Amino acid sequence: MKSNFGQSMAHAGFGIFMLAVVSNAVYSQEKIYDAKVGSKLQLDEYIFDFKNIEQEEKVNFNSIKAYLSLSKSGKDLGEFTPEIRFYSDPPTITSETSIIHQFFSDVYVVMNVPQNQESISLRLHIKPFMNILWLGVVMIILGGIITCLLYTSPSPRD
């Protein structure tokens, strides 16, 4: 086995990575909703059921947390808990994304800063081929490691 194996693996990994990046850019979906508790939101074949919203006070921040369940074709796939955090020192607002990982895609929800008391703005995303993207990255790393381990310096000539 020569060091070419590692190089081939790394290059194949880069090809897989690029294919996943392009496929993700073409096939990803996003939709923004102004939602109220009890709303059922749809993106592609996924149904997002907006269950509840809570305000929490922690030691160093206050937050607004939403609870949504995800289903597809009647099958429950999990629960999202996106969150907006308000830090006082220094004054900062952050958005905590909630993700459900699946084999061929990631589905995630981002909550925007509320503009009124009536509804909350939610961004729903479907990002396909994310695991394939990470497979490409792992192949690049392993290819580099294999190449380094199998590398032999040329012997000096007499």
Each model region followed by its residue ranges:
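Solvent-exposed, non-transmembrane regions of integral membrane proteins
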Residues: 1-153, 157
